[in-house]
Design a protein with these regions (language model features):
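Chromatin/DNA-recognition segments of nuclear transcriptional regulators
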Residues: 109-129
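Intrinsically disordered or highly flexible coil/loop and linker segments, enriched in small
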Residues: 85, 89, 108, 133-137
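Short, surface-exposed acidic
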Residues: 90-97, 101-115
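Short, well-structured alpha-helical interface segments that form or flank functional binding sites
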Residues: 12, 39, 71, 94, ...
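Long C-terminal interaction/binding lobes of large macromolecular proteins
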Residues: 130-145
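Extended interfacial segments that mediate partner engagement and assembly in macromolecular machines
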Residues: 57-98
Length: 145
């Protein structure tokens, strides 16, 4: 099982920019989304890395992400969410538990919002392989993971 340093945990929790090490700034998401507010966010302006906060709070959903990581998180959620939403696992909690075992990460740090690029890529591959194995007729596009 992977163990994390205090610095790595601070990055995964959105307290430190993973690209430059600076402390991110709390803003309203309207600044990013052309005037439409979806709540609070943390941003590192020099790196153009940001993360949204849990609804109604100032708690980041995970690590700050640049454009590449934001896209990988979207792709990881697209394939991972199928696993729990279509009941291939009993629920979201069980799906994350399965993923934590596959990635050999502590459960508390197995959330797509906390992942870096490598972990997102591994999640995408693992989930595609799992779905293809469970239902190859429904997921033929995932034959290669």
């Amino acid at each position: 099982m992977t163990e994390y340093s205090k610095e790595e945990i601070a990055i995964m929790k959105g307290e430190v920019c993973p690209y430059c090490g600076s402390k991110p700034e709390l803003i309203d998401s309207a600044e990013i989304y052309n005037g439409t507010s979806y709540g609070k966010m943390f941003i590192c302006r020099p790196c153009n890395a940001y993360v949204s906060c849990h609804v109604g709070s100032e708690t980041p959903k995970g690590r700050l992400a640049n454009a590449e990581l934001r896209q990988l998180k979207i792709e990881a959620h697209e394939v991972f969410d199928i696993i729990w939403q279509q009941k291939y696992k009993r629920g979201r909690y069980q799906a994350y538990y399965w993923l934590s075992k596959q990635l050999q990460r502590p459960f508390d740090f197995t959330h797509i919002g906390m992942m870096d690029e490598e972990s997102c890529r591994r999640t995408i591959t693992l989930c595609k392989q799992y779905l293809y194995k469970k239902d190859p007729d429904k997921f033929p596009q995932y034959i290669d993971g």
